[in-house]
C-alpha cells in the first residue's frame, strides 16, 4: 500500500485550485462518486444551507445525535487550524490514518478520472469526496452535511433523499456567484429542497422566506418555518454563571424554552451570542422533523454540550474569537460583543481585525467603530492569498483615525501570529 504522511497529503490538497473554469455538473459529480463506490448512498442525511449559522446548526445537530449514541458524521467548512476539523466522527476530528486512507482513495479515483480526459476536482469537491469516504469507512449512519456555497449547484447537492433540509439565515454574500439580492441568494439556497422531503428554515427575512416557501410548494415539500417571535417567546431571563471563578458573573450561556416532540423543553445554549438562539431552535426543529430517535432529555443535553469554535468563543477570560465574514455576521458579532461589554464593563476594548480582500471591509470597520468603540485596533494580514493587503489596511486605519479621532490607537501588522501575541500581551 502506498505510504504518505499527513503533512504530505495536506500539502497536496492545498495545491488543488479552489475554483475551476467550469464548475462540475451534479451529473459529473455522481459519475465521479461511482468511481468511489457511491458512498453518498450510505447515509441518512441532514442537509444544511444558508449564509450565516450553518456551522452552528451543524454543531447543535451533531451534539444531539451523538447524545443519542447514533453513529454520526459531520462535514463542515472551513477549518480553523487543522484541515481534519472539516470531518467529524461522533463530534471528534477524524484520526490521521483515516484521513490519509480517504485521501488515497480519492487520489486514485482522480487518476482514473483524468485519464478519461476529465478535469481534476476542485479543492472543495476533493474534500467532499474525501468526507464521504471517511464517513463510509467509519460506519456512520447519519451525516450532517453543510453546503459549501449556495445550494442548487453545490457539490453536496448530490444528496437525493435527505431526512430534512435546513436553511439558516440568508444575507448578502458571494455576490459574484449567487446574485446581489436576498431573493436571488435565497433561490440558490432553496435548491437543496428535495421532492416531498421536509425543509426547516429561518423565517427572519420575509424576502428569503417567500422564496423558500415557493420552492417547497413546487417540490411538494412540507415547510417548517422558525420565526423570530417563536424564539423570543422562549427566551428565559438568566445569568448562567461562568465556570471561571475569577469572573463568575458572565452571561456566557442563555436559556430558551422550545417545543420538541410535543413537550416544552428548557434548552441551555452554551454560547453568549444572541443569534445562537435561532440556530439552536433551527437544529432542534430539524431534529424533530427528521424522525431520528433522540429523546427530549438527550436533545437538551446535546444542545448544552455543543461546541463550535470561533463563534464568540471565549478562548481566555475576556478574550473572544469570532469568525464573522459578512455584513450580517458582523452585526451579529456586535450584538453579542456589545451585550458582553455592557455586562462586564471592561476597562478597555481592543480588537484584532483581519479580512479577505473581497469583503466590504470599510463598512465592517465603520460598524465596529460606531457600536463597539474599541480603544485599540490592530489591523492585520491573514495567512491567505485572499487577505486584504497591508496598503489597504493602512489606508483603512487612516480613514478610521480621521473620522473617529486620535484618542483611539491604530496599528497595522503584516503577520497575524505576531498580531495575536501583541494583543494577548496587552490583556
Q: What is each model feature region?
A:
Residues 31, 38-41, 67-160, 176-178, ...:
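ATP-dependent carboxylate-amine ligase catalytic core
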Residues 61, 131, 210-212:
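Aromatic/hydrophobic pocket-lining residues that form π-stacking "cages" and hydrophobic walls in ligand
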Residues 114-115, 139-146, 162-267, 280-297:
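Acidic, Mg2+-coordinating active-site environments of NTP-dependent enzymes
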Residues 205-224, 365-427:
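C-terminal helical cap/extension that packs against the catalytic core
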Residues 61-69, 135, 397-400:
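Hydrophobic alpha-helical packing residues
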Residues 142-145, 153-166, 170-171, 261-376:
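Nucleotide phosphate-binding/pyrophosphate-handling subdomain across enzymes
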Residues 1-50, 56-68, 75, 111-118:
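Short functional linear segments
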Residues 191-199, 340-349, 373-376, 403-406, ...:
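Short, surface-exposed connector motifs at secondary-structure boundaries
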